[in-house]
Amino acid sequence: MATQIDASSEAAAATAAAQHTPMMQQYLRIKSEHPDTLVFYRMGDFYELFFEDAEKAARLLDLTLTQRGASAGTPIKMAGVPHHAVEQYLAKLVKFGESAAICEQIGDPATSKGPVERKVVRVVTPGTLTDAALLSDKSDVFLLALCVGHNKRGVASNIGLAWLNLASGALRLAELAPDQLGAALERIRPAEILAADGTIESVPAGMGAITRVPAWHFDIASGTQRLCDQLEVASLDGFGAQALTSANGAAGALLIYAAATQGQQLRHVRSLKVENESEYIGLDPSTRRNLELTETLRGTESPTLYSLLDTCCTAMGSRLLRHWLHHPPRASVAAQARHQAIGALLDAPPNAGLDSLRSALRQIADVERITGRLALLSARPRDLSSLRDTFAALPALRERVAEIASNAAALGRLGAALEPPPGCLDLLTRAIAAEPAAMVRDGGVIARGYDAELDELRDISENCGQFLIDLETRERARTGISNLRVEYNKVHGFYIEVTRGQTDKVPDDYRRRQTLKNAERYITPELKTFEDKALSAQERALARERALYDGVLQALLPHIEGCQRVASGLAELDLLAAFAERARTLDWVAPEFTDEIGIEIDQGRHPVVEAQVEQFIANDCALNPERKLLLITGPNMGGKSTFMRQTALIALMAYVGSYVPAKAARFGPIDRIFTRIGAADDLAGGRSTFMVEMTEAAAILNDATPHSLVLMDEIGRGTSTFDGLALAWAIARHLLSHNRCYTLFATHYFELTQLPAEFPQAANVHLSAVEHGHGIVFLHAVEEGPANQSYGLQVAQLAGVPAPVIRAARKHLAHLEQQSAAQATPQLDLFAAPTVVDEPECNEPPAAATPHPALERLLELDPDDLKPRDALDLLYELHTLARSGPADAQR
């Protein structure tokens, strides 16, 4: 029965296929292999898209949608792009999260019977970009696979991640708890995520394009073996991955997918890094956003810490900077080595110092990405010429580094890495033209002298006329026929023409080609050989050049690891030189590290804000076991958030390996940095501002340790005054008594300033400001002790709130203050022992205080709006009111 069904299905499929033209049958077969991908089908000088693909491409790429004929009764919708411009369209597609299969003609149209043979040669997806036209110079593109591990009860116990930068070949693995997935994805920022059905819902929204992959691709045993095969090792012990489970399953799925998109092996994936949470200072998504490391809160790339630090001379250095900022090591040893290298660069003599080194680095190509394209055999001619020129510049660069490296081991290590693989420079110099064409198909890529056959073909093509002149001269001398001519026409090709009176002198090797009335035309073996070459010389030269170029790529494959080593050394050297330039230009200093708990910053400055203003007020920050929490008060716009952020940024910069904006800085161990600064509704997640605020606070209270740095800004402001005050007090108390972390706690609840009376480890500081008339001048200086008021009305006035609103607010504020004084209900009771009040007293309403009419009148007026005569009249009015009491005024 099953056989009959199969036979019927095959017959139905054959009947359906017969309704299409042979070309459409070919297209539909290829499309069936890539159902979720836009198929770019090569037809002559265009890539065509058909049916639904054409409709989608026309919409996304703004192409003209046409309709030509029908296939199986269905109109064929078409859209196309020129083959020479396809990369720019692919770049647009991947930005939309789409993938494209590039289907090329691989058969010869002249010999093909039916449609020319076609094949998908590569698949372009958001996470597998390697072409320079599709990549941002200063950002990496990651393909990530996600595998959920389950315990015996079937409950998710861990999540394995594997992510690959295909352009460089860098592969990383990690295993983490399910609740850490969001933070990990926020840090990695993959362009594409591979997940099996059933695990896709684990991926937070907005984290990248999601591609469904068969569940069997994530098999752990198969993944482990595939990793070993890829790295050419017997086990993963040497990479620290022997204990991993779900991460190895993710790696297996990732390698299958990446190799399939490229249609070949991933020769440049030869190393593996297992990331452990304990290696780096923890930065949750909120902290990365609030500190504006690589992106502002508005979503722009500048001004950020990254944009300030990125004066790198190479794209490799810029990408490494981005990685370092998101991966600050916990161990201070790495940072100290970087500081030592920066110091050596700054102390070097001018002729061999920082400026000279950076000038040389500006001539360096993007070796990392060129190497990736080499490994995938997709490097273009100018990639190779850039690689050649870079390798040629390395000896001089190594000499400069060697002159500086005597006082810095890190520089010595980097200098040793700047040794091009043996034979590479010689091969590239001999093989590649000084200024090659952009594409191999254009010719002019292989250097003269590299291949005798190619040189001859080029000579034939370029110097055909000269060959004929030389041959004519030689044949006249050999035969003694003075009027012998060597010529060419399109009908008969090349020939030697001899007049009838001279035919008796024709040598035996002449073969008659054509007889004319007054002359005979001949061909010789030499001329025939030349003719065969000349008529196809250009075509054959291009084919020979293509073959030679492919041979050069193959010859470079064994040197991939050496090229990667050079790229890594260049990137780190460039970044350290950029750090040195920033330190010199912006007057930064080398921080110190200690094993003792504490943070000491002398005259610290916010690096990004300082670059935006003419003058920046530097401030000290001291946190230690006796001073674990700073309660920061002061007016809005007074600089509380800036002070808090600058403390975190200076600490982060120190551990990244940069010098810091301060007069001096000293840091104890730091394991994590938390921030609770600002908040907004999470509409997509159905969370209010206050819920977002409390969720972030809960994460801090649950995870902060005595080595964590916590920034809390106005916690509790998203709810009612007393609820917020109670929560802020309880949270501050918990941070002091349980977490015992370094804490900067900014608040407008002045009642909290009594906390140091209960906890000696807490201290009050404030951002100073002075009143000037009804205005305010922010001094931005951090001073000991609490602030005396918040200056809210003055800040509102600065913001442009209309004068009548300010006057009304002042009037109501005075009323509230008088009412509060009359009620005599001290707000500080929140921290004092509870006072027992008799029930009748609690039910008696307080007497309402009546403000003096003169004060009310003063609060109503705006001195800036008064004319001289009005002011005089008002003065008499106020004098009268002042002499009378409230009761008299009411009468």
Curated annotation (Swiss-Prot):
GO cellular component term, pick one: cytosol
DNA repair in keyword set = yes
Q: What does this protein do?
A: This protein is involved in the repair of mismatches in DNA. It is possible that it carries out the mismatch recognition step. This protein has a weak ATPase activity.
Task: Tell whether Transit peptide is among the UniProt keywords.
Answer: no
Which Pfam families is this protein grouped with? Answer: MutS_I, MutS_II, MutS_III, MutS_IV, MutS_V
Where ATP binds, per the record, is at G634, P635, N636, M637, G638, G639, K640, S641
Whose protein is this, by species? Burkholderia pseudomallei (strain 668)
Q: Which UniProt keywords apply?
A: ATP-binding, DNA damage, DNA repair, DNA-binding, Nucleotide-binding
Molecular function per GO: ATP binding; ATP-dependent DNA damage sensor activity; damaged DNA binding; mismatched DNA binding
Q: Per its record, how is this protein called by name?
A: DNA mismatch repair protein MutS
Q: Tell me which HAMAP family the record gives.
A: MutS
SMART domains per record: MUTSac, MUTSd
Please list the GO biological process terms of this entry.
Answer: mismatch repair
The family note in this entry says: Belongs to the DNA mismatch repair MutS family.
What highest taxon heads this organism's lineage?
A: Bacteria
